[in-house]
Amino acid sequence: MLRLDLQFFASKKGVGSTKNGRDSIAKRLGAKRADGQFVTSGSILYRQRGTKVHPGLNVGRGGDDTLYAKIDGIVRFERLGRDRKRVSVYPVSQEA
C-alpha cells in the first residue's frame, strides 16, 4: 500500500497583520550646518553615531558623538587622507 502525505494549503493562513507594522522613527542624524556657514559657539554641526566625522580645530565632541562649535566662526568640512572626514571652525578676521 502506498501512503502519500500531501499538503496543499498553508498551515497558517494570513495571520500576520498584527505582527507587522513596526518601524522606528528617524533619528535626524547628519550635517546641521553647511561648509562656509557662520556659526556661533555651542552650535551643533553634525549629529552622528560613532565618529563618521572627526572633530577638528575649535570643534568639540559630545557624549553621543555630536560635534559642536567651541567658538564663533566659519565651518569647514575637510578630508583627512582617503577615508576620514573632519569638521573645523575657523575664527572670522576682524578686518572691516
From Swiss-Prot:
The N-terminus is cleaved by ribosomal processing cysteine protease Prp. The keyword Ribonucleoprotein applies. Keywords: Ribonucleoprotein, Ribosomal protein. One of its GO terms (molecular function) is structural constituent of ribosome. Transmembrane segments: none annotated. One of its GO terms (biological process) is translation. Residues 1-9 form a propeptide. One of its GO terms (cellular component) is cytosolic large ribosomal subunit. Belongs to the bacterial ribosomal protein bL27 family. This is Large ribosomal subunit protein bL27. It comes from Geobacillus kaustophilus (strain HTA426). The lineage of its organism: Bacteria, Bacillati, Bacillota, Bacilli, Bacillales.
